[in-house]
Amino acid sequence: MKNLFKLNFLFIIFIFISIFAFPTNSQNTCPSGSLNSTAIPIKIIIASNSIAKNPPLSGMLAGSVCSSITGTITTFTFPNGPIINTVPSGLIGKPIIGKIVLDYLNAKYGLDFSTATISQSSSTVSISISNIVKH
């Protein structure tokens, strides 16, 4: 029962942070091949996800992104790293299955995805989402 209370308390804090934290656009230049020429502010909230048989985890990435689409894969790249990153390190580089909430220029989208992968190299963080279905 105490563990359930702790999880509920942490979830409430996570929701509070996700509502009030929105990044500012720092006018980062995107590389050629991106859909946008300058980085655009975004929040990507992974509301419910799982890896194989592990328990569900949650997290959020927020900052200015460059985006690209290759086939059915949409990639959001934070060129200078996300301003907010509450994604557990155990999710980096592993396939994530579940739902996300995408707040793109304050237009909220609920998305399902078959898989997503978060990658990180030095200060650059990317999330690749395959087969996005908008609700």
Swiss-Prot record:
Glycan-carrying positions: 36
Residues making up the signal peptide according to the UniProt record: 1-26
Localization of this protein: Membrane
This protein's UniProt keywords: Glycoprotein, Membrane, Signal, Transmembrane, Transmembrane helix
Intervals, Cytoplasmic compartment: 80-135
Gene Ontology CC annotation, any one: membrane
Statement: the UniProt record of this protein carries the keyword Protein biosynthesis: no
Primary location group: membrane
Mode of membrane association: Single-pass type I membrane protein
Keyword Glycoprotein among UniProt keywords: yes
Extracellular side: 27-58
Membrane-spanning ranges: 59-79
Protein name: Putative uncharacterized protein DDB_G0280341
